[in-house]
Amino acid sequence: MLRTLFIGVFLSLYILLVGPPLLVYTLITKNPDPVYWAGVKGVMFFVRVVGVRIRVRGLERIPRGVCLFVANHTSSADAPAVVGAIPRRIAILLKESLFKWPIAGQAFTLAHFIRVNRGVRDSAIASVEKATEALKSGQSFLIYPEGTRSPDGRLQEFKKGAVVMAITAGVPIVPMVCSGAHRVMGKRSLVIHPGEILVEFLQPIDASKYSLEERDDLNEHVRQVMAAGLPPDQRPVGFPGAA
């Protein structure tokens, strides 16, 4: 709990000190890079300070150009690991409530993150459509296809929004697998444990080979690839090699 308190206090101070001038700079220059990277590097620094090590593999598999990154979601601890591992500025579909955070919410907006209300179907569809248009215009995205954090660390069923985006925009999907984050911080826990999180980029998948009518096939293919890339205790029950 002390580690969580440390991050909460010092990250809040960091946001208060660094956030306002960067927000003003972004509003004037229309360049979201500084506010984005200040946020990513700041969170990564505090995560490391409390004893969480992050290892990254497979960077050479990331294709040039716009792509859609998809990752499994097991814990609040995997978000900084996954975002920090991606070596380019990306946008994210974030739940609407996060945009209400002071300073951070404004930074999310200026970084072109898109708010989504998962509880309202029409609103969620509109958010996916907006993100798809951003993909088409050259903005890479990160999506958690499970839609929410896994309760036990195992890969869950996927929603179809990510593959619909990739097929419609004609961009490759880059699967990412994150292991160990659920042991660092559980889904319903505020306690941060020291440990290691491994983030691995898998081989990209060419979504342009699929039509929208084949979205279920692509969705299942991406899930199978990610399940195979996870350690046995994070694979879905019944999947080959699952513990």
Task: Give each language-model segment a name.
Residues 46-47, 108, 134, 166:
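A generic structural signal for well-ordered alpha-helical segments
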Residues 48-57, 124-125, 181-183:
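Short gly/ser/thr-rich secondary-structure transition/capping motifs
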Residues 58-62, 130-133:
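Short amphipathic alpha-helix with an adjacent loop that forms part of the alpha/beta core around
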